[in-house]
């Protein structure tokens, strides 16, 4: 190929192989941030559900740039994060082969939403006896001593403590009834403090505001949109063949040499596209808060210092194919993996960011709450009524 006078780099990334369907529907955390025992005891991850996207307007703080102190428009993603429920803790010991599970302690009362996750078909299962034997330990003195002994053993021998928490899917407008379960590592403080923190939060809810904060960088772990079986043009981005090519254009002409007499794994082939497990690092939190009031008070989560309109984060008519966000939410810069309603795992950033963009404090000037179905650019129902007037069908008869 020495006669070539143009570049022809390979198409497609070999860093994500095999390109097959993910084994789990939710994002799996394979590593947590490094523990700093000088900090206060805290959780390092949470779970949420993708609601949809909108856009915001803000002033860019980037000295030296032509856009410094000028307005820019950015896309943001809204992730609804109902409170998570803590039901247990796991202690890990360090071995030559890595971390190994030492002991697991469960809470006394476990909801059916959590127990559904342990069954392939909860409806057809006749027994539903999961944890019935374990829970009886809390009813006897010997059982309580056994649980206390397990906690003491974890405090003495374990180096890593993680709580077991599950989402409350019944609070969302989803057809799913099985809760998503997640192990969340507890960082900060000594092992004794971590175990005491976990036990004190048994059968209690944890809010996302207690885990993350505004202007913080987090990692988003999830499964991408599924595209099904696709060809090499869409799957790998290779070049189409010339128009007069025999037996098809959207193919790879040469799939390798005669010998070795097998097709190399680096050759683009047709197959599964999408529904892959992916991790997106360092997504910035632009806003965090409660979407709708719980006690009847007015909450203006869509309000800014420059836009004083009383409105929530929800667009008119709700998010398309999702509905209204009612619980706590995160507003992240850019897009994240997966379709609407997809369960996402949110983790504190593994890497420490010291760049100017990472340390920039975000001040939003405007949050778009217009209809995502294409019904005009009106931000609230009052604006739309003021512009169009009262409809004839809604006007009262004299």
Swiss-Prot record:
Chief place of localization: cytoplasm
MF GO annotations: RNA binding; structural constituent of ribosome
Gene3D superfamilies for the chain: 3.30.1430.10, Ribosomal protein L3, domain 3 (4.10.960.10), Translation factors (2.40.30.10)
UniProt cross-references to PROSITE patterns, sorted A to Z: RIBOSOMAL_L3
One of the GO biological process terms: translation
Regions of compositional bias (Basic and acidic residues) in chain numbering: 1-10
Location of the protein in the cell: Cytoplasm
UniProtKB keywords: Cytoplasm, Ribonucleoprotein, Ribosomal protein
GO CC annotation, single: extracellular matrix
Cytoplasm keyword on record: yes
Known function: The L3 protein is a component of the large subunit of cytoplasmic ribosomes.
Family of the protein in this entry: Belongs to the universal ribosomal protein uL3 family.
Protein name: Large ribosomal subunit protein uL3
Organism in which the protein naturally occurs: Dictyostelium discoideum (Social amoeba)
């Amino acid at each position: 190929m020495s006669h070539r006078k143009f570049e022809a780099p390979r198409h497609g990334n070999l860093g994500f192989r095999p390109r097959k369907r993910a084994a789990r529907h939710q994002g799996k955390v394979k590593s947590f941030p490094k523990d700093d025992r000088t900090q206060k005891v805290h959780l390092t991850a949470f779970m949420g559900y993708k609601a949809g996207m909108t856009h915001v307007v803000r002033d860019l703080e980037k000295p030296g740039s032509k856009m410094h102190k000028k307005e820019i428009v950015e896309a943001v993603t809204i992730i609804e994060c109902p409170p998570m429920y803590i039901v247990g803790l796991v202690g890990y010991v360090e071995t030559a082969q890595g971390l190994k599970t030492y002991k697991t302690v469960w809470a006394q009362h476990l909801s059916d939403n959590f127990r559904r996750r342990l069954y392939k078909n909860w409806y057809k299962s006749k027994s539903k006896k999961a944890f019935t034997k374990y829970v009886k330990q809390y009813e006897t003195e010997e059982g309580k001593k056994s649980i206390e002994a397990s906690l003491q053993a974890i405090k003495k021998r374990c180096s890593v403590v993680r709580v077991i928490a599950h989402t409350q899917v019944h609070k969302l407008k989803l057809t799913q009834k099985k809760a998503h379960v997640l192990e969340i590592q507890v960082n900060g403080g000594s092992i004794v403090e971590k175990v005491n923190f976990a036990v004190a939060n048994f059968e209690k809810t944890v809010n996302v505001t207690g885990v993350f904060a505004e202007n913080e960088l987090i990692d988003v772990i999830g499964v991408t949109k599924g595209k099904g079986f696709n060809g090499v043009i869409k799957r790998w981005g290779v070049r189409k063949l010339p128009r007069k090519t025999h037996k098809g254009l959207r193919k790879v002409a040469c799939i390798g040499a005669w010998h070795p007499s097998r097709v190399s794994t680096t050759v683009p082939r047709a197959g599964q596209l999408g529904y892959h497990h992916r991790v997106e690092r360092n997504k910035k939190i632009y806003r965090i808060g409660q979407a709708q009031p719980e006690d009847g008070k007015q909450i203006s989560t869509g309000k800014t210092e420059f836009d004083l309109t009383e409105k929530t984060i929800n667009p008119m008519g709700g998010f398309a194919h999702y509905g209204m966000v009612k619980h706590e939410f995160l507003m992240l810069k850019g897009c994240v993996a997966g379709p609407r309603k997809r369960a996402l795992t949110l983790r504190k950033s593994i890497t420490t960011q010291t760049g100017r963009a990472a340390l920039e404090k975000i001040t939003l000037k405007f949050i778009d709450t217009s209809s995502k179905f294409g019904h005009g650019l009106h931000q609230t129902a009052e604006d739309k009524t003021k512009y169009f007037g009262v409809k004839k069908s809604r006007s009262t008869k004299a």
